[in-house]
């Protein structure tokens, strides 16, 4: 089975304030969706990659919860239709083109596959600030196992993932006979805050 390994960082896929210090208190806590976000970084490649751009994409986490009673667990969901291409260096019309391609059937097909979600299967505490979370990530209608190494700092829980688009049934965009394209690997970054 394909496996993506999530490492400490920052996007920002796969996952946030899950059973960290709150694990000692048996309770379920929601994520603060006004401050919790997912980011995807897409990188250029190809012979004429100097003419292309890397892309930064962001969406709010739509809902999520942490269960600290019994077996710690975490789950969250992002609406793929709310992903937005940031790319401040691109002109508005070019940014709109990238957005349209990303949303369309060639890439995310977000009108058909609107849900991006993660559900943990096990949680292992490494030390006071670090955890390893094993679970399943669903993207583009495909579910794959992932391993998340997460870190807590200043009330935020951050992690990052390097995923292969092809593992989730997405063919990396390629134009001009492949002289300009994006890499199969993308970085997914998470910044998650628990609700008060």
Can you annotate each of these PLM segments?
Residues 22-196:
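Low-complexity, acidic/polar, glycine-enriched regions of mature
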Residues 9-18:
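Bacterial N-terminal signal peptides
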């Amino acid at each position: 089975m394909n496996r993506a390994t999530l490492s400490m960082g920052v996007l920002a896929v796969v996952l946030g304030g899950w059973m960290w210090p709150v694990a000692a208190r048996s309770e379920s806590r929601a994520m603060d969706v006004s401050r919790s976000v997912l980011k995807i970084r897409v990188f250029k490649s190809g012979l004429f990659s100097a003419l292309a751009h890397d892309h930064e994409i962001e969406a709010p986490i739509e809902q999520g919860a942490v269960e600290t009673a019994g077996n710690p667990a975490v789950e969250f969901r992002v609406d793929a239709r709310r992903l937005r291409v940031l790319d401040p260096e691109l002109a508005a019309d070019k940014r709109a083109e990238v957005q349209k391609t990303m949303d369309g059937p060639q890439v995310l097909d977000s009108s058909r596959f609107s849900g991006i979600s993660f559900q943990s299967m096990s949680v292992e505490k490494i030390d006071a600030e670090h955890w390893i979370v094993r679970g399943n990530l669903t993207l583009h209608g495909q579910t794959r196992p992932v391993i998340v190494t997460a870190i807590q700092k200043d009330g935020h829980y951050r992690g990052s993932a390097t995923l292969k688009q092809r593992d989730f049934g997405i063919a990396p965009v390629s134009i001009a006979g492949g002289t300009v394209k994006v890499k199969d690997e993308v970085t997914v970054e998470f910044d998650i805050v628990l609700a008060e």
